[in-house]
Amino acid sequence: MKVLAALALSALAMAKPTPPMPGMSLVQTGPQETRWVTAKEKHDMVMNHIGFFDITNRPESASIASKPKSYAFPGNVSHQAEVKPLLEKISADHIKSNLEMFSSYPNRYYDAQSGVESAQWVMEQAQAVVGNIQGAKVEMVKHDWMQPSIRAIIPGKSEKIVAVGAHQDSINGKNPQGEAPGADDNGSGSMTILEALTALVSDQKIAGGEAANTLEFHWYAGEEEGLLGSQDIFQQYSQEGKEVVAMLNQDMTGYGETMGVITDNSDPNLTKFTKMILDTYTSAKYSDSECGYACSDHASANKAGFPSAFVYEAVVGQDNPAIHSPDDTIEKLDPAKMAEHAKLVVGFAYELAFATL
């Protein structure tokens, strides 16, 4: 009977709460801060760059804040001979060409047909990149809304996961289903990691499954509406006992001069490692910066107990002012800057793919 009672209490705790009014969302804006908001209030938060988790479908996650496991990340790079030839394959022109297509959709809103179509396009590109690699796969991750997340998996010798992620959705802050090319936010990050994946799988050891760890590349749905897709993925990984040893987030990579290395809601040891990768494999200048609670998808990994890092296009406050509007277009972006971010991703992924963690 005690077991049945415990199960009943557990089911009650997991039940979806009833909003005060239809259409409201439960958002978390701090470790102990949750509140119900209307659709307008939620989109005002987006326009005002207030980070939040939408936990309407995962209310139990409000009390989840697992401390990320500590790993001894490498203190030195070990694979320059293998990585540097891959960096030469990074093409700013190719990133630009892909981004022109990706930002041509009217919007990539998470609950619109155009958001579904843009996700399908990403999946097709990723499949073309990894389709001939034995054991590799690209799959859709379905959610409770229209747009799926996309996941590419390149198996290694272990099931430990090194993940790279970027959100694929876009939003018009004044009219969520209005025009939102989202070239920088976050077409730039999405195409940056696609370019990095293309370079990485040209390496015979990566393609041959000889890496110590498994590589995953994620394109998340619904980031703009409260980190929805990344929450689903990392909470599921946590529940399934999967071991994500590192996650690198790429959200906006095309604007500004000095990259921002985000130091809040991220893992300090992984961030230190990431700076070493920047110094070794890119020509980028960077400075420390903070982006606040739940500002992007690395926060979902961090909350689920996985070490994460985030390198942003600029120090917060010096980033692209045109995001969340019809003016977030490719003409304002620097493809060479995106290529430097892609080099970061290649170095990060390769070094950790072969690291003993």
Curated annotation (Swiss-Prot):
Glycosylated residues in this chain: 76, 186, 269
Hydrolase in keyword set: yes
Keywords per UniProt: Aminopeptidase, Disulfide bond, Glycoprotein, Hydrolase, Metal-binding, Protease, Secreted, Signal, Virulence, Zinc
CDD domains: M28_AAP
Family: Belongs to the peptidase M28 family. M28E subfamily.
Enzyme class: hydrolase
Annotated signal sequence range: 1-15
EC numbers for this chain: 3.4.11.-
PANTHER family: AMINOPEPTIDASE YDR415C-RELATED, METALLOPEPTIDASE M28 FAMILY MEMBER
GO molecular function, one term: aminopeptidase activity
InterPro entries per UniProt: M28_fam (IPR045175), Peptidase_M28 (IPR007484)
Positions bound to Zn(2+) 1: 167, 185, 251
GO cellular component: a single term: extracellular region
Disulfide bonds, paired cysteine numbers: 291-295
Region listing for Disordered, in residue ranges: 169-188
CC cofactor: Zn(2+)
Top-rank taxon: Eukaryota
The record's free-text note on cofactor binding: Binds 2 Zn(2+) ions per subunit.
Protein residues bound to Zn(2+) 2: 185, 224, 324
Protein's name in the database: Probable leucine aminopeptidase TRV_02148.1
GO biological process: proteolysis
Reported function: Probable extracellular aminopeptidase which contributes to pathogenicity.
Complexes and interactors: Monomer.
Protein localization: Secreted
